Amino acid sequence: MITLVRRSFGIVLGLLLVAASARAEIVKDLYSAEVPVADQSPAQLASASRDALEVVFVKVSGSSSVLRNPAVAAALPSARQHVQQYSYNKDPGVPGGLLVEMLFERSFVNNLMIESGAPVWTANRPTVLVWLVKEEAGVQQFVNAETDPALVAQLRREFSRRGVPLQLPLYDLVDTAALSVDQAKALNSAALEQASSRYQLQDVLVGGFALQSDGRVAGKWNYFSGSDRSQRSATAESEALFVREGVGLVAEAMAARYAVAASAQDVGLAMSVTGVTSYADYAGVVSWLESLELVERADVESVQGDRILVRLQAQAAADQLATVIELNKQLVPIPVTGVGADLNYLWQK
């Protein structure tokens, strides 16, 4: 059984997460997915392409609900036609198992999402710090590369599958002195704040589970972002499925904040950026803006001292685009009057 609660949470990690930044990374494998296959036959490849495209659609939108979109569902049977390249790999989790990794056409995926009105979550995404405690045969310990490398690998795969950057604690002397297993499971606010503060991340996922004698797993996930907390209790058939629940909790919550239902028509927006003092600044601003899935073009219209005025051809309104831009901590919103721009920022080095 799974329950989900979202509410304002101002005590546990509140001070830490408000002060910390939503450090973001560019997800480079947004349009690729790896799925299992029985063999290398054309029939298996065709079936796998559909499965892989489902993963990509969910990754790009951030939410599994995108698969209920009629246009998205209608595109799945022809998935094989839109595979740019593929390769086979051994499945490290299944003896003798086989995986196929597929890369899909970026333009096909983005155009379909935009034309269907499905939400699009740009590749610039917040990094999540994960503390995970496992209990087996009465023994509790943090899950890390030494105690449970297979589960760590599963955690990495699930975050990659949902397109969310992952930060695992170092679990060195600094971490273990700041946070004990019991404190993590009890959500001890002071200890979690102290242990997490060194990583300077706004998004923290804390999980704890017990492995039962029949192999089933029972536990709970708590996801903190700023002053908000999401909670999910889960009973799963395996550790892998329990991990999937936790990662899904994060991805769905993030997508609700950052994914934008793009407009099929381009919107012309003027963006003012102050603090541009070198060609490197100039190129950095323009190239980053053009890397956003919701921005078709970013053309510099004028340069006045250290301020540039950029004309954006975007598939989102100004307020929607501002939500995405806030993830770049070098672009700080500023109140500017008399400039005639829809968006105003300071380029902070």
Report the location of each language-model feature.
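Bacterial N-terminal signal peptides
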Residues: 8-19
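Sec/Tat signal peptide C-region and signal peptidase I cleavage site
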Residues: 20-24
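Amphipathic beta-strand/beta-sheet edge segments enriched in Tyr/Trp
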Residues: 27-34, 38, 196-244, 343-348
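Short, well-ordered alpha-helical segments
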Residues: 32-76, 191, 242-249, 280-290
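N-terminal segment of the mature soluble domain
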Residues: 49-72, 125-126, 130-137, 141-185, ...
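Signal peptide-directed extracytoplasmic domains
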Residues: 65-134, 141-146
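A short, hydrophobic beta-strand-centered structural micro-motif
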Residues: 81-90, 167-170, 184-216, 325-342
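C-terminal soluble interaction/assembly domains
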Residues: 225-239, 258, 265-349
